UniProtKB/Swiss-Prot annotation:
GO terms for cellular component: cytoplasm. Belongs to the UPF0235 family. NCBIfam families: DUF167 family protein. InterPro entries: DUF167 (IPR003746), YggU-like_sf (IPR036591). This is UPF0235 protein PF1765.
Length: 92
């Protein structure tokens, strides 16, 4: 779910688009991913943009999708942050 790199932390998520609001809804134990509802449709990158905006606001850091651009399962790189900081912000 979390891997520290020289650039920051890789966070594995599973996305549910077209939700009422964008929020973290739990942990998918089987997949080892954070479950995130996204209040945007999966059309023309809208859900991806909303997802990155949400995590940028949460962590106060740049966020990029490093894997899963067109999939519900994504790996996000949160730049310039430690694994400990991510755990604290996610309240894991």
């Amino acid at each position: 779910m979390l891997r520290e790199t020289s650039e920051g932390v890789i966070l594995s998520v599973i996305v549910a688009p077209n939700a009422r609001e964008t929020k973290i809804v739990g942990i998918d134990g089987t997949r080892g991913r954070v479950k995130v509802n996204v209040a945007a449709p999966p059309v023309k990158g809208k859900a991806n943009k909303e997802l990155m905006k949400f995590f940028k606001k949460l962590f106060g850091a740049e966020v990029v999708i490093v894997r899963g651009e067109t999939s519900r399962e994504k790996d996000l790189l949160i730049k310039g942050i430690t694994k400990k900081e991510v755990i604290e912000k996610l309240e894991l």
